[in-house]
Amino acid sequence: FEMPYHFEIEASFLDGKEEGDFPVTPPLEGNHGPVHVAYTYHFAYEDGTPYYPVGTTCYVWELQSEELQEETLRELAKGYFNKIRFCVFPKHYIYNFHEPISYPYEGTPCDTSEMTEKNFGEYKTVDHGNHWDFYRFNPKHFQHIEDCIQKLAALGIEADIIVMHPY
């Protein structure tokens, strides 16, 4: 993985071509590299160190308030888990009625302020102010997720990221 990389992007949402370079460096001290399957039924880091995942799921911890994010990191720092699974995209569900701190796309979210635990299953809204531009990512959203991944790595915790959440 370690080498300089060059990228070129041409797309309908860009004015012209974007290109750039970035280096991939060796892991920092204490980081064993990415996790992969080893010997068919086990896991290991890139350097061969065995990895025994003991994890938890916190679907949108990184999209909650800064206070709750810090509380989550303090709890994880106690060492109970070495892996946390979470979503890249915000999610409303019975345990989460808060608006996320950011969204992955540019645009305006629908108003869910009237959603409650009691009406969650039946809540339907047609919000004509809901304007998402699914062709334009919100870079700050993903920069924040990368920052959270770095904070987890500093604690020795692997990020198990849910990209698509069909249920």
Which residue ranges define each predicted feature?
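Ligand-binding face of N-terminal immunoglobulin V-set domains in extracellular IgSF glycoproteins
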Residues: F1-P27
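Active-site mouth of glycoside hydrolases
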Residues: L14, P27-Y167
